Regions:
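Ubiquitin-like/PB1-type beta-grasp interaction modules and other compact soluble beta-rich domains
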Residues: 2-93
Length: 94
């Protein structure tokens, strides 16, 4: 049997993503050495499991993610345990 080590990521919520928690951040547990793509997948599962009746379904695919240094990060960005990552949903308007 293989033991999988996990890490915790703090996801700082902005805009419509604030509907996911009554706090400023959401704690997400991921396997060690996960990247942003895996964070998106985990967030999609959380939304489908807990918020299936909301309109947040496209949030993980369409949102931008930012590092602690406020740099836009892509899906290959390697996450670190206890890292603070910000999620910025798309903003519409006209």
């Amino acid at each position: 049997m293989v033991d999988i080590d996990f890490m915790e990521i703090q996801l700082k919520l902005y805009g419509s993503s604030k509907l996911l928690s009554d706090k400023e951040t959401l704690l997400i547990e991921l396997p060690e050495n996960s990247n942003i793509e895996q964070l998106r997948n985990s967030l999609s599962k959380i939304i489908s499991d807990k918020y299936s009746k909301s309109n947040l379904g496209n949030l993980p695919k369409s949102a931008a993610f930012f590092s602690e240094n406020n740099e836009v990060i892509n899906d290959n960005y390697q996450l670190k345990n206890k890292e603070l990552i910000s999620i910025i949903p798309p903003i519409g308007g006209g």
